Amino acid sequence: MFGYVIPNQAALSPEAQARYRSAYCGLCRRIGALHGLRGRLTLSYDLTFLDLLLSSLYDGETALHTGADHCPIHPIRKVDWRSSGPTDYCADLSVALHYYNAQDKWNDDRSLLGLGFEALLAAPTAAAVERWPRQCSAIRACLDRLTQYEAEGSEDLDAVSGCFGDLMAELFDYKQDHWSPELRSIGFHLGKYIYLLDAYDDLDRDLKKGTYNPLRSLHQLPGYEEEMREIFELLLANCARSFERLPCVEDVDLLRNILYSGVWLKYNCKHAKNPPRAAE
């Protein structure tokens, strides 16, 4: 359920692409510094977006660090990086999210990969829990609710996707301050979008395997594709509305690129492969 909140690289200037890469590398670097090489396995575009958003919103409140270094992925050529206070926050959330997700994969499917990842991330997550107990508790509680809905075979899209929406709302609420309502709104609607897009993307595979998918019945109804498009548009419109109320200046064009264009890339790719059937 990761990798949907991405930039549209084709629509970015070379300078904006470089700034995104420096933020991505900065998050990777801080994950490594806090949690070691194993932690870097949890790096995602989704947490890079949160880092960009919080770093822009709270610009000037914490020191900005920049540099250029070699890394395990780039051992020959140095890469530029940047990080600030929110970067460490996102680094902790990254390992916690992947830990609890791996825990669920082992508990639900007896996935050996999940078990291995859970063991690998146990110590880093314990450190993250100490620093961010509210957020980590919310991750576990929301995933538990989601597991219950899935066990029941629920097709209540609002309730099921709302679990992941609540989870993301808690993570976006960095400081519980006067920006909380808008940050929580962005996280909530983006979380619902991510969950439903993941279900939309996985539907064919889930149908073949006979595994749970909340869209199992809906996809058989006339107008399914149009309804999903409307749901996605509404959720992202709510994200954008709350985002535009925030006084973000740094990287605002990059953030808009992600929210208005990048988040649609995987939907557009999937939709192009499975266009709506023409009415007979």
Please place each PLM-identified region on the residue numbering:
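Acidic catalytic motifs of isoprenoid enzymes
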Residues: M1-S185, K192, L196-E233, R241-D251, ...
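Short, electropositive alpha-helical surface patch
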Residues: L254-Y260
